[in-house]
Amino acid sequence: MHRFIRPAVLSDTGPAAALLGRAFADDRLYVWVIPDEHVRRQRLPGLFAAQLGIAHLGGFETDVMCADGQILGCAVWSPPGASPSVLQQLVGLATFPLIPWSRMAVALSTFHQIGRARPKEPPHWYLSCLGVDPPAQRTGVARGLLTPRLAQCDEARARAALISGGANVPFYEALGFTATLKINISGNGPTHWVMWRNPRPGGKRVRRGVD
């Protein structure tokens, strides 16, 4: 099965959002925000569709890995200097009707704390979202999606940053990221980490067809 990476197009929004909904269905952050599994699985695709819309409006760069006509994984990057515009923030507000009212205060507090911790300086590529369809997880899709972009960072001598739940910290450490700030979500929510990656010497561009 030949896998390849390409830039996402607008028509990928639906399939990619559905994929991300499946990928994050059991993620501790979303379990914390939407504890009811049925509601969570029903509403996450809409949440991610809004996020992908923000990415499209904001000039973010979204990579998808495909095979046999299917999207296996999706990575959303915010380029150096990008910042949400008023329009993007309004689009982001469209996600909140998808949060159960009983969890609205928790969701607002949680995402405010994570957003406040998001790195701003120095300039960097920010990994906004990375998800792999569950049947393709642990088959190299996530690493394959990130490797070309990180090689591009190395070549350009650019930093990269992200925010991750604790379970994924070792994966990102293996790619050169270092945890620099612990985010303790109030109310005993899931711990997250701000992670930075400095460019590695001798970086070379990696082809986007991965196997």
What are these regions (language model features)?
Residues 44-64, 122-126:
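A short helix-loop-beta-strand connector motif used in the catalytic cores of GNAT acetyltransferases and
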Residues 74-131, 137, 147, 184-190:
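Conserved acyl-donor/pantetheine-binding loop and adjacent beta-alpha core of acyl/acetyltransferases
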Residues 123-125, 152-165:
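Conserved GNAT acetyl-CoA-binding A-motif
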Residues 128-137, 160-170, 186-192, 197-198:
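Conserved beta-strand-loop-alpha-helix junction that forms the acyl-donor binding cleft
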